[in-house]
Design a protein with these regions (language model features):
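Helical scaffold of the NTase/Pol beta-like nucleotidyltransferase catalytic core
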Residues: 194-198, 229-253
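Active-site microenvironments that recognize anionic phosphate/pyrophosphate groups
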Residues: 1-223, 227-230, 304-306, 321-324, ...
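Short amphipathic alpha-helical segments
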Residues: 233-240, 316-319, 323, 461
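Amphipathic alpha-helical segments that form well-ordered structural scaffolds
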Residues: 240-244, 326, 468
Length: 496
């Protein structure tokens, strides 16, 4: 049985370009060592090619039966199947050489190769990502994309218990560091033997390109600094983002903000995110245009979007960077008490920007999303943060991906929405149902609008979740889409 499985996996590696015939014996021997086998008889023929995950699952079952896999938990299985795939994964130098050769053909050819490679090695676990729920909701700002993230497995209590007694390591310093390439991992850090990163240069500095293992959108990539240094939004950030889209014009690139609450989950390591995907924000038009006197070659305006966005367009990268830095500098020190915008309190800064860069034909385009992370007694999680009434759907920070119009919602919603569907169809008292009680007030607000049946309830709930997401983005917007908010936004524009 194990000979058959090893032969299947080697055939998969050959078919998907991970290895060639010269590597076949070498890789086979590596797998034999891993599975503690001293004998091997190559099967005369293999059956119909199977999906990678089916082969890996069978190999894991064999490993479990032999005591090679200690515990049958998701974490332990992931550590071992990554080690298995690491044996098939070419050395970094090989992958980088192919990427460079493909880049000479075109940037798109290079990223297409690298993306398919990252899927073939199982670094991107496509079998899990397809479990994510995804749909679109029409709003006045365009089609919002809503996802329920089901691809990140939850920790097994057995692994949590083991991890609690394990010796802690500071290597790699974080999940983004270049030292992850080839790292074996442990209970609290994923294995990365099948991970390969691509060096790129942005404004003379060394960065690396990789894909997100969770791929929230097409070719979702991460561009991270060679060094473990904190996130920062400044003039060089704008320059680097535009330099990236200049080198990869078919990709967009953006940065999370550099302050807590309005930033992403990793503020400790300088990085950007990008990919081959057109977000709803990119499709949103100018709502109001204005002139920047010092930058006459820049087409500037406010974008029709639930958050407060200034868009800059131009042919000269230097002009856009200078204009963006001017706006950032102004915004960092700007207060407007009439609309609760304070640049700092007790010396703690609150204003920052979430920037997004893209090419629009032969024009550079930079969207600057104004952010403020002030908290109040009534809003301890943030004044410009999802309001309490929407926490049953979304209470987490609004980061870069969501700013652009793609919701990443927690896995708990899948079960809760399924129960909500049944409770509504059964005309239950929603407030008496422990699982859906948190959603009761929200659901009671829209149930009367529809003639609900078992054939439309699912799509109705999806639509209403999408509407909530648009509202959540409005909550995160520093200038509300009211007459008062628009007048306040105008005051800031005039200050430029």
């Amino acid at each position: 049985m194990i000979d058959q499985l090893i032969s299947e996996l080697v055939a998969y590696g050959l078919e998907n370009g991970l290895i060639d015939d010269a590597d076949k014996v070498y890789v086979t021997n590596g797998l034999l060592e891993l599975f503690q086998r001293q004998d091997y008889q190559e099967p005369e023929k293999l059956g119909k090619p199977r999906k990678l995950q089916l082969i890996l699952d069978d190999l894991l079952e064999f490993a479990l039966s032999q005591g090679i896999l200690e515990d049958d938990t998701v974490t332990m299985r992931d550590l071992l199947d990554t080690k298995i795939m690491g044996i098939l994964t070419p050395a970094p130098s090989v992958v980088r050489k192919i990427f460079e050769e493909k880049y000479q053909v075109s940037p798109k050819a290079a990223t297409e190769f690298y993306y398919h490679f990252s899927q073939a090695t199982n670094y991107i676990r496509t079998d899990r990502i397809i479990k994510d729920e995804k749909w679109e909701t029409d709003t006045e700002f365009g089609k919002m994309v809503i996802t329920i993230n089901l691809s990140k497995p939850e920790k097994d209590p057995r692994d949590i218990a083991k991890d609690g007694t394990a010796k802690k390591s500071g290597y790699p310093a974080c999940l983004l560091c270049r030292e992850n390439e080839g790292y074996a991992g442990h209970l609290s850090h994923p294995a990365r033997q099948n991970h390969r990163i691509i060096p790129i240069t942005l404004c003379g500095e060394q960065y690396y390109l990789q894909y997100s293992p969770y791929v929230y959108y097409n070719e979702h990539c991460i561009i991270f600094n060679k060094n473990h240094i904190p996130m920062a939004i400044n003039e060089i950030t704008f320059n680097k983002l535009l330099d990236f889209v200049k080198q990869f014009p078919h990709y967009m690139a953006g940065s999370n903000a550099d302050l807590p609450i309005v930033g992403g989950s990793i503020l400790s390591h300088d990085h950007f995110q990008g990919g081959s995907y057109v977000f709803a924000m990119a499709k949103a038009p100018y709502e109001q245009e204005f002139d920047l006197e010092s930058y006459p070659d820049i087409h500037a305006g406010i974008v029709k979007w639930p958050m407060s966005v200034i868009r800059l367009q131009g042919r000269a990268m230097d002009s856009i960077v200078a204009a963006a830095n001017h706006i950032l500098t102004k915004w960092r020190g700007y207060s407007d008490p009439e609309v609760n915008i304070f640049s700092d309190t007790d010396g703690i800064p609150h204003n920052t920007i979430t920037p997004i860069a893209r090419m629009r034909g032969d024009l550079y385009e930079l969207d600057l999303v104004l952010r403020n992370n002030i908290t109040t007694i009534d809003c301890p999680l943030g004044l410009f943060h999802p309001h309490t009434e929407y926490h049953h759907i979304k209470k987490e920070n609004i980061g870069l991906i969501e700013v652009m119009g793609l919701a990443v919602l927690p896995a708990r919603l899948k079960k809760e929405m399924a129960e909500l569907e049944q409770a509504i169809l059964n005309h239950e008292d929603l407030r008496q149902n422990e699982t859906v009680a948190a959603h009761a007030e929200w659901a009671e607000g829209w149930i009367p609008k529809y003639k609900i049946t078992d054939s439309n309830i699912h799509s109705i709930i999806q639509k209403e979740i999408g509407i909530v997401f648009a509202k959540v983005l409005e909550d995160a917007g520093v200038y509300k889409r009211t007459d008062e908010g628009k007048a306040a936004f105008k005051r800031f524009i005039e200050s430029l």
